[in-house]
């Protein structure tokens, strides 16, 4: 009996057993080998197949190929190589997101893209605009949008897991000795603020989910205008909604909301307002820690007086300084003007600080010389600049307190644009998104409360008119200002200054630029503040501004 060569053995094994790939999955090969050694009879019992090879005439030994036999449920696991389509689509989306981050949003690959920090900031901002951009109603988020927000935000935030800092740590040897090693932990700002932002995010999503069964509903603006005469449930729209024509109009029942529903709305509003304050605090802290970019400092004027203007500079350098009085004299009737004043104050602060830094360097050089008088003059200038910086910062703080939702200034936008720290970029963009979301929820709640208040007032007026009709009085005659005082006791109004509304009464005098006083005009002094962050005035006027 002749023996076969090794080459013939390889041919036989390749013909009988098929080709073998070294890159095959280990788990798959193990499962295949385990299943190939057993066969199952009709009753479910397994018996082993003889593993010894049998001899084939003229060909040598024949090794039987492994065969996958039926699998009994509960005893073995079925291996499926096919992945669901949704998993494949999520992987493709993740690849696309991270490709944009690595390329810096430059799809040409020429290296002209933005830095990684700005790319992540833009990605979080664009994701929030996609999911929450049309937050026009108090209703739960669609399941698709909610899943998209959680999935893609987790992809973007996973970058922070690799941002760590090294700290010394003491470890012990098994024999009793100790040695010092450097240990990694999350960076302190991310460790403190990122879990808090995730908690605020979850609370806002849960708040929207709670508006699944409400007593109010919404109608498109075109439908409201078209059916104005037919709909008996029409509720008056707020002044803000007349400007924001694309927003749907909230509607309430003819008798208004129930006390329980109104109380729930008020609680949600207070809760959202607290979330807004927390997000603002985190965002302000992160922006304050960012470095001031050089391009911003290069665009500043040479003097603080040029930044502020003549009027603000005179008030700021006066002997008696009151930030509240100065703000009352300024024109803060629009968002653009208020933001412009904030930009001027910030620019003046950094101009004076730059001068102090330069003079400190000159002072250090002049100490070695004999120019004592010049050094004394530089010290006086530094003290004066420090004094002006303190007053300007006090004025800016008072402005932010009066308008807590002031938009980002030019300095803030430059910090975001030129920031290189990825961790700070994640915290700033995430907190800004939470701030915007909390503000929009508060605005939507204010819309519903305003419509409910208007409905209650109309009901009270109707009841008053019906009461006069029951008593036999003509309401038109009773309240007519054209009748004589002798004909109706209601016709003569009480011309008393104290009868005016304390919040809407115009000032009796206004300060002019030259310091003189003149009588105020109601039409000029009573201007509506339409800025998005004026949270304090919304409760008084019932007008809720909108953040674009």
Swiss-Prot record:
Phenotype upon gene inactivation: No visible phenotype under normal growth conditions.
Region of interest (Involved in auto-inhibition), residue spans: 458-548
Miscellaneous information on this protein: Plants overexpressing ROPGEF1 or ROPGEF4 are relatively insensitive to ABA-induced stomatal closure and become severely wilted during drought stress. A similar phenotype is observed in plants expressing a constitutively active ARAC10/ROP11.
Compositionally biased tracts (Acidic residues): 1-12
Subcellular location: Cytoplasm, Cytosol; Cell membrane
Pfam families named in the record: PRONE
Keywords: Cell membrane, Cytoplasm, Guanine-nucleotide releasing factor, Membrane, Phosphoprotein, Stress response
Function: Guanine-nucleotide exchange factor (GEF) that acts as an activator of Rop (Rho of plants) GTPases by promoting the exchange of GDP for GTP. Acts downstream of PRK2 in the control of polarized pollen tube growth by activating ARAC11/ROP1. In association with ROPGEF4, acts as a specific regulator of ARAC10/ROP11 function in ABA-mediated stomatal closure. May play a role in the Rac/Rop-signaling pathway that controls ROS-mediated root hair development.
Residue spans of biased composition, Low complexity class: 19-36
Native source organism of the sequence: Arabidopsis thaliana
Protein name as annotated: Rop guanine nucleotide exchange factor 1
Inhibition and activation profile: Phosphorylation at Ser-460 and Ser-480 by PRK2 releases ROPGEF1 auto-inhibition, thereby activating ROPGEF1, which in turn activates ARAC11/ROP1.
Tissue: Expressed in roots, cotyledons, leaves, stems, sepals, petals, anthers, pollen grains, stigmas and siliques.
Subunit structure: Interacts with ARAC10/ROP11 and FER. Forms a complex with ARAC11/ROP1 and PRK2. Interacts in vitro (via PRONE domain) with PRK1, PRK2, PRK3 and PRK4. The C-terminal region is also important for the interaction with PRK2.
Any coiled-coil regions, as ranges: none
GO cellular component: apical plasma membrane; cytosol; plasma membrane
Domains as described in the record: The PRONE (plant-specific Rop nucleotide exchanger) domain is responsible for the GEF activity. The intrinsic dissociation of ROP4-GDP is stimulated 15-fold by the PRONE domain, whereas that of ROP1-GDP is increased 350-fold.
Region of interest called Disordered, as start-end residue ranges on this chain: 1-38
Domain of life according to the entry: Eukaryota
PTM comment: Phosphorylated at Ser-460 and Ser-480 by PRK2.
Residue(s) carrying Phosphoserine: 460, 480
GO function terms (MF aspect): guanyl-nucleotide exchange factor activity
Annotated effect of mutating residue 484 to A: No effect on function in polarized pollen tube growth
Annotated ranges, domain PRONE: 81-462
Gene symbol of the encoding locus: ROPGEF1
GO process terms (BP): pollen tube growth; positive regulation of Rho guanyl-nucleotide exchange factor activity; regulation of auxin polar transport; regulation of pollen tube growth
InterPro entries in the record: PRONE_dom, RopGEF
């Amino acid at each position: 009996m002749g023996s076969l060569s090794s080459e013939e053995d390889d041919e036989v094994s390749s013909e009988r057993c098929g080709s073998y790939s070294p890159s095959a999955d280990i788990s798959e090969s193990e499962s295949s080998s385990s299943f190939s050694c057993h066969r199952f009879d009709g009753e479910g019992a397994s018996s082993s197949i003889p593993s010894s090879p049998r001899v084939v005439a003229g060909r040598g030994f024949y090794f039987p190929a492994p065969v996958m036999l039926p699998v009994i449920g509960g005893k073995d696991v079925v291996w499926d190589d096919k992945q669901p389509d949704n998993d494949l689509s999520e992987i493709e989306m993740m690849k696309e997101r991270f490709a944009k981050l690595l390329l810096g949003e430059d799809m040409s690959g020429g290296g002209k893209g933005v830095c990684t920090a700005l790319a992540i900031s833009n990605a979080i901002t664009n994701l929030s605009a996609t999911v929450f951009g049309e937050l026009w109603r108090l209703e739960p988020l669609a399941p698709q949008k909610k899943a998209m927000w959680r999935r893609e935000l987790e992809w973007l935030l996973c970058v922070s897991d690799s941002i760590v800092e090294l700290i010394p740590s003491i470890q012990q040897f098994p024999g009793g000795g100790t040695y010092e090693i450097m240990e990694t932990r999350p960076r302190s700002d991310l460790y403190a603020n990122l879990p808090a932002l995730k908690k605020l995010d979850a609370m806002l999503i849960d708040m929207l989910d709670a508006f699944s069964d409400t007593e109010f509903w919404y109608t498109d603006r075109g439908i409201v205008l078209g059916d104005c005469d037919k709909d008996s449930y029409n509720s008056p729209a707020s002044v803000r909604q007349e400007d924001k024509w694309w927003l749907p109009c909230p509607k309430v029942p003819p008798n208004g909301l129930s006390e329980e529903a109104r109380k729930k709305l008020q609680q949600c509003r207070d809760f959202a307002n607290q979330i807004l304050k927390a997000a603002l605090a985190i965002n302000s802290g992160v922006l304050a820690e960012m470095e001031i970019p050089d391009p911003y400092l290069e665009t500043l004027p040479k003097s603080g007086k040029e930044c502020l203007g003549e009027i603000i500079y005179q008030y700021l350098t006066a002997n008696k300084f009151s930030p509240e009085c100065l703000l009352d004299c300024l024109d803060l009737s629009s968002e653009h003007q208020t933001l412009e004043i904030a930009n001027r104050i910030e620019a003046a602060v950094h101009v004076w600080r730059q001068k102090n830094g330069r003079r400190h360097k000159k002072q250090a050089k002049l100490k070695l010389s004999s120019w004592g008088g010049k050094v004394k003059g530089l010290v006086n200038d530094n003290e004066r600049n420090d004094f002006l910086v303190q007053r300007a910062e006090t004025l800016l703080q008072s402005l932010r307190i009066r308008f807590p939702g002031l938009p980002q200034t030019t300095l803030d936008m430059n910090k975001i644009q030129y920031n290189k720290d990825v961790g700070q970029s994640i915290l700033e963009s995430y907190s800004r998104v939470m701030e915007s979301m909390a503000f929009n929820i508060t605005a939507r709640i204010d819309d519903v409360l305003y419509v409910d208040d208007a409905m209650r007032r109309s009901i009270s007026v109707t009841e008053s008119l019906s009461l006069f009709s029951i008593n036999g009085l003509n309401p038109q005659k009773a309240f007519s200002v054209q009748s004589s005082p002798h004909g109706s006791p209601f016709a003569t109004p009480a011309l008393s200054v104290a009868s005016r509304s304390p919040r809407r009464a115009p000032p009796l005098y206004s300060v002019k630029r030259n310091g003189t006083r003149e009588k105020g005009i109601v039409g000029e002094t009573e201007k509506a503040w339409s800025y998005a962050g004026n949270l304090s005035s919304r409760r008084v006027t019932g007008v809720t501004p909108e953040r674009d």
